[in-house]
């Protein structure tokens, strides 16, 4: 995704290569969250079997588990479902420590029957059939799920412009030397105002966001999500509220 949640940046291809190579060197397993797969709108992703492809550490190591959410990439939010894609080499690997601790030594079985079984309530048959059908339609070029989610980029571009117009700045603004993409989330700050103070101040003007501090960030600011900006009048309303905020705080 871009920006990623809760890092607010996207790892570049060179960074992912480093992670993958180190995972192989030190025999470490990479758990890669691709919940917002394809939502880097700086690139023309989403054309099946055609470059460019989703950036991933899995290109550089066999020690990976990819987590992909149906509710995010397909906007299939009713019956929650996701997949954990394990490399063939890793899924068949036998770990004596897992056998001793859980009674199941092969990684895939231990991961599914010990961790996923305990951490989730499973998935309904209808959701499994639906996800399989959407994967097939996407692979066959019949479902442009990246194109459908591009709406979030349009919303983010408009909302970001409103915040910047009224004196806010983008906190996490670049992936190394490239500007972050417009996507589901972005981050803003207002001068040097602490995160918690900014959350409280915005609430007084009817604007809801979460503190960057709550996500482990050391930067001052808030996270903005554009998922509910789905009516034209909301942009005019946000513009007025941010204008009032800026006018009041410019006097302080």
What are these regions (language model features)?
Residues 85, 187-189, 225-227:
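Short hydrophobic/aromatic beta-strand micro-patches
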Residues 1-47:
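Active-site phosphate-binding strand-loop segment of PLP-dependent enzymes
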Residues 30-32, 131, 211:
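Hydrophobic residues in well-ordered beta-strands that form the structural core
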Residues 60-150:
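Conserved core segment of the aminotransferase class I/II
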Residues 32, 45-71, 83, 222:
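Conserved active-site segment immediately N-terminal to the catalytic lysine
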Residues 27-29, 63-65, 208:
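Proline-centered loop/turn at the N-terminus of a beta-strand
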Residues 125-128, 132, 145-164, 170-189:
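Conserved glycine-rich beta-strand-loop-beta hairpin in the small C-terminal domain of fold type I
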Residues 60-61, 200-252:
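PLP-dependent enzyme catalytic core of the Aspartate aminotransferase-like
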